[in-house]
Amino acid sequence: MIYLKDTCVLIKKFDTSEMIRVAGIYKDTNDTFALTDIIMDELRPGKLVNQCDAEKSKSLLAGIKVLENSHLLETYSVKDSGKYKDNFDKIRRAFYGHLKDLNFVKQALAKGEITKEQFKNRTYIYKDYGECSCIAVAMENPTEIGIVSNDKGRIFLKPNINLFNKYKESDNIQVFDYEEWKKKIEININSEKKA
């Protein structure tokens, strides 16, 4: 199976050595470590990475480079034109159009749902980009591609809507939290050892 990792699970659950270790395990189990180009962009220190996560983020990017050079990473291009970009754009239009509605955003600012800094820098527009990119890829082949994310799937400023659940229902995507994914990998390792 191809396991797409989301930004939150990479930053919160992985370090470089764990990433490389897992990729090595995948080699033995015929699973694939995968990311989207948008996830890799989200890992770059800057507006989207918290200051406290900047060093870890740099380290993860170095680990990703090792995986790329070792041919242990599959990267999906969502930013370029094609079916993944089309899927991504549809998801963003359908579920995140409210982030381009200035009246909606001003109300969120007044309620304290968006910080003044987010409003000023317009970083709120990019909320959940990584999750959307993973869904855009997974919906093309939901039996072979799963998403590993500890994000709950709630849409920014519309927490009653769960994006992961929407696409589980409509496109049969598979989403695993870190612990669930780790158990699956351990089962795969044990079954490979027995074979």
Locate predicted features.
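Acidic beta-strand-to-loop metal/phosphate-binding motif
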Residues: G146-D151
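Active-site-proximal, substrate-binding regions of enzyme catalytic domains
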Residues: I2-P142, G153-A195
